[in-house]
């Protein structure tokens, strides 16, 4: 069998092209080899979903005055939304509606899917409240257990036959602790003895165990010293890559770099798209 000699082939798309002197018949091929330059087809998927609030109004039972009036906004998945405005304007009320703690008087809160052409793919689905996590301002006021483990597993299923769910929650717990930096905290420690920053981390971990589609935070930096504020802001930057965040805050400077969309709540419960004033 003859041996062909290659002369310094030049790679094209990772494949060396043989020189013109190369004969495929020398190694037993019946047809000459043909080398074609081919490009991998580009597959672009732009499908995405948004959490959409559509013309939502809210009037507390037994009253005649709306706290929220015709609120509309759309928040794309895995993005960071910020709502700011004066105290008493209705920001926290809106968060409570999103979390399912109250129901809108009118309007809807839904998840809308979109195709790569930017058009709605189908009718929207109502936002399931079990897929929404909320961390209130000063969350330590809502702690109920005397150790970290009992606090984070409070509300887990206790009945027989729930082993598979418990195993999934345990796996989620390990991931949540890693995400928020609690893996070095003793599980038998009283959560009320944690620093302010670590109390916020614990409150975040409790919600993350449930793998929410939307995580809502009400004043996440309030009452923290400068170092804890910086740590929580850094944590939110990481979480933004994993899930959708909606934050109500007066601390605009620390959060401005994270914001993808922002709105100002005006007195009277009207929401207006606006960049945070710095």
Curated annotation (Swiss-Prot):
The alphabetized list of GO BP terms reads: chloroplast organization; transmembrane transport
Its Gene Ontology cellular component terms are: chloroplast; chloroplast envelope; chloroplast inner membrane
Q: Where is the ABC transporter domain?
A: 51-278
The protein's matches in Pfam families, at most eight in alphabetical order, are given as:
ABC_tran (PF00005)
The answer to keyword Cell cycle applying to this record is no
Q: Where is the transit peptide?
A: 1-49
Query: Which PROSITE patterns has this protein been placed in?
Result: ABC_TRANSPORTER_2
Tell me which InterPro entries the record gives. Answer: AAA+_ATPase (IPR003593), ABC_transporter-like_ATP-bd (IPR003439), ABC_transpr_CbiO/EcfA_su (IPR015856), ECF_ABC_transporter_ATP-bd (IPR050095), P-loop_NTPase (IPR027417)
Positions bound to ATP: 85-92
Q: Which UniProt keywords apply?
A: ATP-binding, Chloroplast, Nucleotide-binding, Plastid, Transit peptide, Transport
Q: Mostly located where?
A: plastid
MF terms per GO, please?
Answer: ATP binding; ATP hydrolysis activity
Tell where it localizes. Answer: Plastid, Chloroplast
**Which family does the entry's similarity section mention?**
Belongs to the ABC transporter superfamily. ABCI family.
Q: Per its record, how is this protein called by name?
A: ABC transporter I family member 11, chloroplastic
């Amino acid at each position: 069998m003859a041996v062909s000699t290659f002369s310094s082939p030049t790679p094209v798309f990772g494949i060396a092209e043989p020189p013109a002197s190369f004969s495929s018949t020398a190694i037993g091929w019946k047809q000459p080899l043909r080398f074609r330059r081919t490009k991998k087809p580009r597959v672009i998927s732009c499908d995405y979903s948004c959490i959409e609030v559509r013309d939502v109004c809210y009037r507390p039972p037994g009253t005649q005055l709306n706290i929220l009036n015709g609120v509309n906004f759309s928040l794309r998945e895995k993005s960071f939304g910020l709502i700011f405005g004066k105290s008493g304007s209705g920001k926290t009320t809106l968060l409570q509606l999103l979390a399912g703690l109250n129901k809108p008087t009118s309007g809807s809160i839904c998840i809308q899917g979109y195709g790569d052409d930017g058009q709605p793919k189908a009718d929207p689905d109502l936002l399931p409240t079990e897929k929404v996590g909320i961390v209130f301002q000063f969350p330590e006021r809502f702690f109920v257990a005397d150790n970290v483990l009992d606090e984070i597993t409070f509300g887990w299923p206790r009945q027989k036959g729930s082993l598979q769910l418990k195993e999934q929650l345990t796996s989620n717990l390990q991931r949540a602790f890693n995400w928020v930096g609690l893996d070095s905290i003793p599980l038998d420690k009283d959560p009320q003895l944690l620093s302010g920053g670590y109390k916020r981390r614990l409150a975040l971990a409790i919600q993350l165990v449930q793998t929410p589609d939307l995580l809502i935070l009400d004043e996440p930096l309030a009452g923290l010293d400068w170092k804890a504020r910086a740590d929580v802001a850094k944590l939110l930057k990481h979480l933004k890559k994993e899930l959708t965040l909606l934050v109500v805050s007066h601390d605009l400077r620390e959060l401005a770099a994270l914001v993808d969309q922002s709105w100002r709540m005006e007195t009277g419960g009207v929401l207006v798209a606006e960049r945070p004033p710095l």
